[in-house]
């Protein structure tokens, strides 16, 4: 018998060619996307994004009977104005953080809980690629469910005659939604990779810290994601109707470039920190 025939499993593992970071991320993405789409979280997500669709149907039904679903200072708010309010209050202020918390914190925590993380880490792939691949799957999964909901709400509320004038603003709103999912997902991916009880910490951050600091005067709000994300909303809406109402709710509205710079900085920094945490942390599986 030769020495090679007595090689240990780890020696055989070491002899395998190591996949590149990009190729490994793509492989993990392919495997994770199907699992996410058919998971219980997707059912929860469908129920969450179904709320605005149901509300839009109610508004449409009210307006079909000649009544006004929303008035501001005695003036009727048009269909796209109602859509803008729903984008701000329901999607950006609630749905995006909720999905970021429940999906982002679970990217690595679920693997630890299911005791499958050892299998992933024994493959000849960079550890960080596991997180990036699962993060990309999270983005694809949430966008595949959330964006159709937004489009349904838009076409229910906005008259066909107003679509040519408002479709550009809709695209900006969809961009804000995508950016919000990306940034919250990146932040909570780090929380899930670094902390032991990530869901609790994520909920406290999104619906505790952010909500309290936004309501308080001072500079602390500048260290929240919601401050920069919601500050972009007036820029994404037409300069009439409900825009003045929304702008009145913001004591401070930073320039667009400042908001985008901070949001992309949050995204890059926390994804990098999450990747480093996965590469360096020693995960201990509970019996």
Walk through the language-model features, giving the residues of each.
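Hydrophobic/aromatic residues in alpha-helical transmembrane segments
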Residues: 100-104, 117, 152, 184-187, ...
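Short cytosolic juxtamembrane segments of multi-pass membrane proteins
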Residues: 280-287
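Helix-loop-helix units of permease transmembrane domains in multi-pass membrane transporters
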Residues: 29, 106-139, 278
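Membrane-interface helix starts
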Residues: 33-48
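Short, membrane-interfacial amphipathic segments enriched in basic
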Residues: 3-27
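Secretory targeting signals
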Residues: 16-17, 53-106, 131-195, 199, ...
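Terminal transmembrane helical anchor/hairpin motif
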Residues: 3, 59-83, 194, 199, ...
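Membrane-interacting alpha-helical segments
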Residues: 22, 26-37, 168, 172, ...
């Amino acid at each position: 018998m030769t020495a090679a025939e007595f090689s240990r499993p780890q020696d055989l593992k070491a002899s395998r060619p190591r996949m590149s970071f990009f190729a490994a991320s793509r492989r993990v993405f392919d495997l994770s996307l199907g699992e996410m789409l058919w998971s219980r979280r997707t059912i929860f997500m469908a129920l969450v994004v179904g709320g605005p669709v149901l509300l839009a149907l109610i508004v449409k039904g009210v307006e079909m009977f000649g009544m006004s679903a929303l008035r501001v200072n005695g003036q009727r708010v048009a269909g796209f104005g109602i859509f803008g309010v729903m984008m701000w209050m329901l999607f950006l202020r609630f749905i995006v953080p909720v999905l970021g918390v429940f999906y982002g914190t679970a990217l690595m925590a679920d693997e630890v809980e299911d005791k499958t993380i050892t299998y992933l880490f024994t493959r000849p792939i960079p550890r960080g690629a596991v997180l990036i691949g699962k993060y990309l799957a999270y983005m694809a999964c949430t966008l595949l469910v959330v964006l159709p909901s937004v489009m349904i709400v838009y076409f229910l509320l906005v008259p066909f005659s107003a679509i040519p004038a408002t479709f550009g603003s809709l695209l900006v709103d969809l961009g804000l939604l995508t950016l919000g999912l990306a940034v919250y997902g990146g932040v909570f991916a780090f929380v899930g990779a670094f902390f032991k009880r990530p869901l609790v910490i994520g909920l406290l951050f999104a619906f505790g810290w952010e909500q309290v600091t936004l309501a308080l005067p001072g500079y602390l709000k500048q260290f929240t994601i919601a401050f920069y994300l919601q500050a972009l909303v007036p820029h994404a809406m037409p300069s009439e109707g409900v825009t003045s109402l929304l702008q009145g709710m913001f004591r401070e509205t930073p320039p667009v470039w400042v908001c985008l710079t901070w949001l992309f900085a949050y995204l890059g920094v926390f994804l990098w920190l999450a990747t480093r945490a996965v590469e360096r942390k020693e995960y201990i599986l509970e019996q």
